Amino acid sequence: MAKVDVVSRVTELAEQVLSSLGMELVELEYKHEGRELVLRLFIDKEGGVTLDDCESVSRDLSQILEVEDIITGHYRFEVSSPGLDRPLKKGSDYEKYAGRLVKIRTFEALADDAGNKRKTFLGELKGLKEGQVHIALKEGQSAVIPLDKIAKANLEFEF
């Protein structure tokens, strides 16, 4: 099965399992690390993910993956929380984490409200309105970034 098909099918199965457990899929990675093939899921739920949650998802989804036989050959399967630097992937993430410190990287340089062009924005996430992310920058400016211009966005840990 082609990599894109594996990712699509595993995502579908993972979302079914996670939904039944009151959790969500944050990100799915399927890639080679050295000579080893790795399938890695990052999961989350309201209040945070515990080790028991990761074990339950790993056990339940492993059984389904065995039966479905989607991935041929040996691979390592990991289930983890997204961590303190959780990626923001869906539009709802930008609403859910409003008020938090974020780092956003864009595909191309965009201007903040002072006209300064940049590809990296660090500041307080204000939310999502009409497909655009609003952020109050550390330097005092603000920026409005279209979702389709975001290459990567993560929560930042505040000390």
UniProtKB/Swiss-Prot annotation:
Gene3D superfamilies: Ribosome maturation factor RimP, C-terminal domain, RimP-like superfamily, N-terminal
NCBIfam families reported for this sequence: PRK14647.1
Protein family (similarity comment): Belongs to the RimP family.
GO process annotations (BP): ribosomal small subunit assembly; translation
Native source organism of the sequence: Geotalea daltonii (strain DSM 22248 / JCM 15807 / FRC-32)
Name of the protein: Ribosome maturation factor RimP
Coiled coil: none
GO CC, any one term: cytosol
Keyword Cytoplasm belongs to the record: yes
InterPro entries: Ribosome_maturation_RimP, RimP_C, RimP_C_sf, RimP_N, RimP_N_sf
Keyword vocabulary terms for this entry: Cytoplasm, Ribosome biogenesis
Function recorded in the entry: Required for maturation of 30S ribosomal subunits.
Subcellular compartments: Cytoplasm
Gene: rimP
